[in-house]
Amino acid sequence: MKSIKYYIQKMLGNWLHEPIIPAEKTTGFSLVRSERSETNMGKNANAVAPYYLHNVQLGDYSYLAKNAQVANTKIGKFCSIGPNFCSGLGVHPTNGISTHPKFYRGEMVEYMPVSIGNDVFIGANVTVLDGVTIGDGTVIGAGAVVSKDIPPYAIAVGCPIEIKRYRLTEKQIAAMERIQWWNWDEEKLKNIRTMFNDIDGFIKKYDV
């Protein structure tokens, strides 16, 4: 017979991780409860609680590890995003008397959308600033602050962000962008597993 302790833990766990749909955009973040508003989750997409999501599109099979704080961000398909991810949370002016929104709210642009492509891998503790575009197939190293656009299939790290190299050659990148395997149906996606390490063979077969 299960103990009373088990049922108490189960009850508390369900309560702590119960999603909340706020009436309007919230400005805080709870370490134990999750908040989601104006957010679309694709097929088999997942966000691990706790999280704060506002005006987010999370593509098919993409996931956010715990403690994500994301707003005004479009995330493509098959993205793998590590814990403590922050994106699109707004900008503060630095050329005025104050940086506090009390003095400029409604008078200027506070948010600019973020776009993250497909098949993007983002490590732990990464922050993406407003208005940034991250291309398909990109890798962002842990702890990076992404303050500028990152082209497809780049490997970028650091603060300030710096492109170290590219995952593929220029010709391979162009071919992958034409193939767009992330838009395939379930049956066709099985071919990626069978050809996983044969990039040139994969391109030769499907870049037609």
Q: Predicted segment positions?
A:
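Domain-scale signature associated with acetyltransferase and cell-envelope carbohydrate enzymes
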Residues: 1-119, 126, 170-208
